[in-house]
Amino acid sequence: DLYWEVIEVPTEDLKSKDSYYSFHLPDEVNRVKGVTAIILKETPDEKELPEIEKREGKNWIGLRIRNKGKITDIYINQLADGRLMHSNSWIEADGWSTDAYMFIVTYPEKSAPADAKEYFIGYGSSLKRGTTSYFSSLAKLFIIQKEENRRMQLWIDGSTKVKAYIRSLQCPVSVSVNGESIPIVYDHSNLKIEL
């Protein structure tokens, strides 16, 4: 039977936790191609709901969500689902290159994706746009990055030791990882993270 479990994840502002439902299929399957979005209204009268557009490209599927002046692009890498271990799982999606299973980029409606200050990288070691690196690590990690008023908040999981580089156009005035402040090591638009 189809079943679900409740999973705790960081909230959008990374200050607390929120619960989400993970649905599990009754049988093991080799490949599932699909994205499901369930949007619940805050009130019965709510009329302004997100606009969702289905998207796909070579070896990826995704969504573009427009809501309250922001665009969120969601990409699922169909080569990085765990079946191709030790194989190349790189994709090119809308100018981004990555080996991540999933990545999400959020940016204001009137700006370009390259100017985004919010990212999610799900089990990846690199995110690039052209020759510009936005994230680089020797280990595949889970990362949430949110930058506002030159304050960088990160949530990182996936390895006990982390050495990563994250793009930031200006040197942040503060950096926190998983709620803890860390020293700022910044050089040429790159923030070095060592845990």
Name every feature range the model reports, one short phrase each:
Residues D1-V173, V177-L195:
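CBM-like, beta-strand-rich accessory domains located in the C-terminal region of large
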